[in-house]
């Protein structure tokens, strides 16, 4: 369903519409293409999978046994991805790969990180991208160049995000510190720093709303904060049940009016952040949801654990069965 104006009623009507259950382990990361109806997933079975979200079909699967698959995001091209590695980081240094799903080919390796990449973000306006690693660094890259374009050394686990104009990027770290940089002159240091007081946990994820007015922080102890992106003030916050060993992900809706998140008890939640209140709570049968994202241009979100689910407004019909893979490469 195409994206219409969201309201509390439509959000409450969201229900599971398709299920893909043939993953060989936990799903690590999911990402939508900005303009095409495509979704990519990475999972514990070392696979990358491409989905047509308009028709709920799996289009392709490729396996990457040498490096594994961890964080993944689309570039601007609908068949090109950036994927981080899980294996051989110390021996090869090949922490990131630029690859083509069209012919399962590595287009470029990006070396530098000495530990897992836990945050990955593509610029919305050019070929730049950022990666944050457990080696306590954020690196800035250009798809056209092998060498790292810049490095920022930090304390603790970093989370990174560009705003939707690509002019500003944010880095969040433990203790609730959020630093904002001008992407054109980041070497001058942050132009603003916010502190989310009272929470000493590491930040697991950070996102900007599409309108650039809000930021969404998720911590490793399952607290969620919505911040004013201009002043750094906390607009609202939510606490979820703990999920031992499984970080949860929260997401904005495209209009920036709602936030959705999983919880350690296996439930899903939606809040209206303009008048902070919970508007929906869903039970699901797939366990703790570790990956959750709302589609950029559709009334649809995906939730994943070891199973991938597509959620759409309930029209009274039964969930659609998932199609089998149409293309598979080793």
Swiss-Prot record:
GO BP, sorted A to Z: flower development; regulation of long-day photoperiodism, flowering; regulation of timing of transition from vegetative to reproductive phase
Keyword line: Flowering, Nucleus, Repeat, WD repeat
Compartments (UniProt record): Nucleus
Species annotation: Arabidopsis thaliana (Mouse-ear cress)
Family label: Belongs to the WD repeat SWD2 family.
Protein name: Protein ANTHESIS POMOTING FACTOR 1
Cellular compartments per GO CC: Cul4-RING E3 ubiquitin ligase complex; nucleus
Tissues/organs with expression: Expressed in the shoot apical meristem (SAM), embryos, seedlings, cotyledons, leaves primordia, young leaves and roots.
Function of the molecule: Component of a chromatin regulatory complex involved in regulating chromatin structure in the nucleus. Promotes flowering under long days (LD) via the regulation of bolting.
InterPro entries reported for this sequence: G-protein_beta_WD-40_rep, Swd2/WDR82, WD40/YVTN_repeat-like_dom_sf, WD40_repeat_CS, WD40_repeat_dom_sf, WD40_rpt
WD repeats: 22-61, 112-151, 153-191, 198-237, 242-281, 284-323
Major localization class: nucleus
Deletion consequences: Altered shoot apical meristem (SAM) and increased growth rates, as well as prolonged vegetative phase and delayed bolting resulting in an impairment of flowering under long days (LD). Altered expression of FLC and SOC1.
Gene3D superfamilies: YVTN repeat-like/Quinoprotein amine dehydrogenase
PANTHER family from the UniProt entry: PROTEIN ANTHESIS POMOTING FACTOR 1 (PTHR19861:SF9), WD40 REPEAT PROTEIN SWD2 (PTHR19861)
